[in-house]
Every structure is written in C-alpha cells, then in structure tokens.
Amino acid sequence: MKIIGEIPFFSTNLGNAYLGDSLELLPKIPDKTIDLICTSPPFALLRQKAYGNVHADEYVEWFMQFAGEFARILKPKGSLIVDIGGTWVKGFPTRSLYHYELVLELCKPIAEGGKGFYLAQELYWYNPAKLPTPAEWVTVRRERVKDAVNTVWWLSLDPHPKANNRGVLKPYSEQCH
C-alpha cells in the first residue's frame, strides 16, 4: 500500500514503511485499506523521556487521536495490536491502571464515545532484560519484584478478525495424551 504524496522510507515485496509524524501520515491513508496495525507507542512512564511520553492521567485522551485514525483505516476484519508497558503511581508501590483504562475506552461502543473495538486477546511479552524499576520499590525497599512483562493487546472492529493460529501451534507433549 502506498501513501499518496509520500516516499517510503523503505520498501519490500511485503509493503512499505513510512517515517514521519503518524498524525500527519495516517489521514493520507485511504479508509478500510489496512489489515494490521502493530504499534508500541511511548509508555506513560513517570520520568519524561527525550522522545516524548505522556503522563498516565493524559494517556487515554492522547491515544484516542490515533485510535480514531486506526479505526478508519482498518479493514472490517483488520487487527490493531498495541504493545504497552505498565507504569507505577508516583510515590507508591502500586501500579497505574492507565493501560486498562485505554483498552476499556477503545472497546467502549461508538454510541458511548468509544472507538467500538473488540478485545480479541491479551498477550504477554516477557522481557527478562528490563531494568528493575522503580528502583525505590524493587532494589532499595525490596517491596516489589522486577516488572518484566508488557501487555500486548489484540483488538479488532469485528469480533471475528482475520486470523489463523496454525503458524504458531505446537504439538501436544506426550504427557497430555
């Protein structure tokens, strides 16, 4: 798929990749033309990063500007995959619920102000190389264990998105027979 008026950053026989501000590029993509959107937006971390990240209290509103475009460009059975890490509540050894709030808002019906997505499945990316943060609760006070998991949300505008699990199935072990 080509974006009219834009030069791909690189191309393969599988498609094109574009480099730019997604809020400027997304409106140039025709309606209902994309099968899969896979994104890992900046997480709502406690410390501000050079690449820019939004505070957890503002995250849902910030993400919704992208979500509207995602819903517009996805094919009816297309999928939106969002890899999003958790964060902590400042000053407390408790987790923020911002990524759950985001999924609830994405899955809220359009008539109620949401985007009308369905949650097909939540997956988990285990990353043992993640730093032990926040240090105060993990390495200093030792009240929490290291967070080594990101949630990967699989959403679709249809309860039956285009999918086929045959490429990831593993044979059952002898113990299961």
Show which residues each predicted segment covers.
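Core catalytic lobe of class I
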Residues: 2-177
